[in-house]
């Protein structure tokens, strides 16, 4: 074991990727640092853990997850597949390109269960504060053990922050919303469309969450869905029952007034207004301050905190790629901590960051964003031994996905893609997505006899 201690905060996909990167090194017979990982939930998986709870959890901590019932992947699984652990290896059979949350969570766990990673994780443990001790070149981290109700501290040579950035809601105020008589919630607290059956729903925001929650509510029987946008509409071909309107100006009782002068009564308002990058355990001089960008400012290679080279952030970007991008970041971070990748001086790092930040500003369309993140991942892979894969083909799938959604927002999840890792083409799910109301793993993997007439695709337009 190397004479280094590495602390990892968070055991979601990013934290698990970091553990997997070190495990990969250890399997080659090479020494690795002493590693400790801390997770405030009682299980790994981060955002992929579903809980019925909202607000606070069992121990009074803010709920981390934003997952809801009936959530299915909104992008092809072939675009997020691990290069060292494929869907075929895990499920032993082809599955559809858009599986539900429970299926993806099972896949994430499958890879990490092959290792002893759980031995490195202390669950129900919250990071409360971090200090950097300049004289020792170490971080002092104060933790709370939620089960024992005890506080303790640890010291690390490197600190990896993998806490994600989709758990602290951005909650704007709209005049009159405090007197709205119906349900008002942020998407973070949305737990299922079945509570909005036969309701008129207003979604404020034009994010992926607005898009998906809107379609989910339509699918499960909401009377109407309105999506209110600030700058640009989503622009999909919406079915009857879903419409887009410009931003809400104010509320009067249960009536929302819009910038175009129109108004309508609603039963519920769901704020799909994004999330904040929040790190309450980090002091100001160690805190990443960024919005949801494809390339966060002040992170060298999107990973190393430029003001303190021993502080590492994983998964802090806006994301097209997810699991496999976290892997490439973790492999880069590992090799840097092991001394294989030397950082240039701060002036050169500043220029490198500025180059990427400026490049993002010139990327406007969804396809350009995909190309941007593809090039970013290519650069990271070239610097490590992470198993390479055909990123250009994955990028083409992403672009096809963008077109699929624009063409048919309700049925794009019925399309199938071919894995670049295995060459296996996905199978169509036994039930068209708009007809499938059961998102359980058991139902998904079962061979179900279907009534073809009953499942024939309806014209929702």
Curated annotation (Swiss-Prot):
Positions in coiled-coil regions: none
Binding site for NADP(+): 72, 74, 206-207, 209, 230-231, 413
SUPFAM superfamilies linked to this entry: FAD/NAD(P)-binding domain
GO MF assignments: flavin adenine dinucleotide binding; N,N-dimethylaniline monooxygenase activity; NADP binding
Annotated binding of FAD, by residue: 14, 39-41, 47-48, 64, 74, 127, 319, 322
Cofactor: FAD
Temperature dependence: Optimum temperature is 25 degrees Celsius. Retains 20 to 40% of the maximum activity at 0 to 5 degrees Celsius.
A UniProt-annotated Pfam family: FMO-like
EC code: 1.14.13.148
InterPro entries listed in its UniProt record: FAD/NAD-bd_sf, Flavin_mOase, Flavin_mOase-like, FMO-like
Catalytic activity: trimethylamine + NADPH + O2 = trimethylamine N-oxide + NADP(+) + H2O
Keyword annotations from UniProtKB, A to Z: FAD, Flavoprotein, Monooxygenase, NADP, Oxidoreductase
Induction notes from the record: Expression is induced by TMA and HHP stress.
Functional summary from the UniProt entry: Catalyzes the oxidation of trimethylamine (TMA) to produce trimethylamine N-oxide (TMAO). The produced TMAO is accumulated in the cell, functioning as a piezolyte, improving both growth and survival at high hydrostatic pressure (HHP).
Family from the record: Belongs to the FMO family.
The protein, known as: Trimethylamine monooxygenase
Organism, scientific name: Myroides profundi
């Amino acid at each position: 074991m190397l004479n280094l201690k590495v602390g990892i905060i968070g055991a979601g996909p990013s934290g698990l990727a970091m553990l997997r990167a070190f495990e990969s090194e250890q399997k080659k017979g090479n020494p690795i640092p002493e590693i400790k990982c801390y997770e405030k939930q009682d299980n790994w998986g981060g955002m992929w853990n579903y809980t019925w709870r909202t607000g606070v959890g069992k121990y009074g901590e803010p709920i981390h997850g934003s997952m809801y019932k009936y959530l299915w992947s909104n992008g092809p699984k072939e675009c997020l597949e691990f290069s060292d652990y494929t869907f075929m290896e895990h499920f032993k059979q082809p599955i559809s390109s858009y599986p539900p949350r429970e299926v993806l969570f099972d896949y994430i766990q499958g890879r990490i269960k092959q290792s002893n990673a759980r031995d490195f994780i202390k669950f129900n443990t919250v990071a409360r504060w971090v200090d950097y001790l300049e004289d020792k070149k170490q971080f002092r981290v104060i933790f709370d053990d939620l089960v024992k109700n005890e506080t303790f501290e640890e010291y690390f040579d490197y600190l990896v922050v993998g806490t994600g950035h989709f758990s602290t809601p951005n909650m704007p105020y709209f005049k009159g919303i405090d007197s709205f008589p119906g349900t008002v919630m942020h998407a973070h607290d949305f737990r299922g469309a079945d509570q909005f059956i036969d309701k008129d729903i207003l979604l404020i925001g034009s994010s992926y969450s607005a898009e998906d929650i809107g379609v989910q509510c339509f699918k499960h029987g909401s009377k109407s869905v309105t999506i209110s946008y600030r700058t640009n509409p989503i622009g999909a071909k919406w079915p009857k029952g879903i419409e887009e309107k410009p931003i809400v100006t104010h509320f009067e009782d249960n009536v929302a007034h819009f910038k175009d002068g129109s108004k309508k009564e609603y039963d519920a308002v769901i704020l799909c207004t994004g999330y904040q990058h929040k790190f309450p355990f980090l002091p100001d001089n160690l805190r990443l301050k960024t919005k949801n960008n494809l390339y966060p400012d002040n992170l060298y290679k999107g990973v190393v905190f430029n003001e303190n080279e021993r502080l590492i952030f994983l998964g802090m970007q806006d994301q097209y790629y997810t699991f496999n991008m976290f892997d490439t970041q973790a492999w880069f971070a590992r090799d840097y901590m092991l001394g294989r990748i030397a950082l240039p001086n701060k002036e050169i790092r500043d220029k490198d960051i500025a180059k990427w930040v400026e490049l993002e500003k010139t990327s406007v369309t969804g396809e350009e964003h995909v190309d941007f993140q593809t090039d970013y991942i290519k650069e990271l892979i070239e610097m490590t031994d992470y198993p390479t894969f055909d990123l250009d083909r994955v990028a083409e799938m992403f672009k096809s996905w963008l077109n699929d959604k624009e063409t048919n927002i309700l049925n794009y999840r019925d399309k199938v893609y071919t894995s670049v890792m295995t060459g296996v083409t996905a199978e169509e799910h036994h039930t068209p997505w708009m007809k499938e109301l059961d998102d359980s793993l058991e139902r998904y993997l079962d061979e179900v006899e279907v009534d073809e007439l009953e499942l024939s695709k309806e014209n929702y337009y």
